Amino acid sequence: MKRTFLSLMLTCWLASLLAAGNATARPPEARAATLSLVYTLSFSQPHTHLYEVAFTIGNVNAPQIDLVMPTWTPGSYLQREFARNVQEFAALDESSRPLRWEKANKATWRVETGSANGRARTVYVRYLVYANELSVRTSHLDASHAYFNGASVFMFVKGATDQPVKLKINAPAGWRITTPLALAPGSDGFYTAPNYDVLVDSPTEVGTHRLLEFDHRGKRHRIAIWGEGNFDEARLKEDFAKIVEQGALMFGGLPYDHYTFIVHVQQGIGGGLEHLNSTTLQTRPDAFSPRKHYLGFLLLTSHEYFHLWNVKRIRPKSLGPFDYENENYTRALWLSEGTSDYYGRLLLRRAGLMTSAEYLENMVAEIARYEQTPGRKVMSAESASFNAWIKGYRPDENSPNSAIDYYNKGDLLGWMLDFEIRSRTGGKKSLDDVMRYLDENYAQRGVGFPEEELKGVFEKVAGADFTDFFRRYVSGTDEID
């Protein structure tokens, strides 16, 4: 691409944007009856970094059950082997007698329940989780706070991830609990989730953190901040509300009762992870000033908030319900992640939180990054998405030559597709309409889109053929010119 041409084209159309499997044995099934699934999480000695997990499994009528620790967390496409942090596993019956168990594979504990002839039993499981890795993908516990990403803490009963669960959090005196989970009415502090997916998609911050709150469009929004930084509380609430409003304008409302932003402010950390009705953001203490730093933080916030729709609801069919034991492959992360980068920037501009000059500067930087990556000539956006499990989170010295970043390429594809749709429809349609179509026809029905139908969605919205575009730029490696 030529810089002068790109700058001119970006400037010309910017105004229009603002308008708008078990390896050893076949596991036993736990499906014969609806189980009672209750977790209790304690941390009586937080300085040890050890979470104490009690898992009560009632109405068990199978002679064996498999308890599985996830090997990865949704939104972060790498096998993280959370079972490595589990210690002191034990299983007991109703009389506190030990039950026999064995490891069936690296992440599965097989328990002999003692149930015979279909007689229902209750199994009590206890284990510890070591949590001293501060990232958005893991859990962290020390004397100052507790943060948990559920996939790294809670085992599940194989075959029962679709059943309701409850969670009790025993927090130290003086520590508040901020979580997207809802309290069960009259339950004496038990939180509830309709299934395991929602439980582990609800990151939780416990401690003496700041808690900022604002209402927007009748919905409560909370910002839990752990750590000290150069932020202005009133400005944060105001700017977050502007981002929320742009999402609501684009999709015609907010698909939640309440939303939680968890913000960790510490030296040496950064990044974000999307969740169903929340996000975790990590940043440095100086991320809120000067303006260049603050724009970076707002871009992160906007990107993760846009995931509320794009990937948490508008998702490839393969990304939910999740298989927590194996890789979940998709060729569409360029859309789920890269296009969220594109809209993260665009929502800030539409909200007035980024100037036209800042928008163009950021966009040109993405173009330069892409053009300086030789791997663009050998790896497609689809291939980068599919190989995220072995490439995306494991860069080495040869990565720039052999691979591309699906965030970066997907960001540019979002821009190109938006431009193509606007051009082919005389400005009557845009990428916004594609996202709304995916939301209305898939997300709101609670299903993922088949990836083979994605091109057809663009064609339906634009009334034009996108075969050549997808062949060259999505599944192919043609140079963008």
Model-identified regions with their sequence ranges:
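Bacterial N-terminal signal peptides
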Residues: 7-19
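Boundary at the C-terminal end of the N-terminal hydrophobic targeting segment
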Residues: 19-25, 32
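Beta/coil-rich, acidic/histidine-enriched accessory regions frequently appended to metallopeptidases
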Residues: 26-28, 441-481
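Early extracytoplasmic/domain-onset interaction patches
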Residues: 28-72
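Non-catalytic architectural context of zinc metalloproteases
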Residues: 31, 44, 74, 79-88, ...
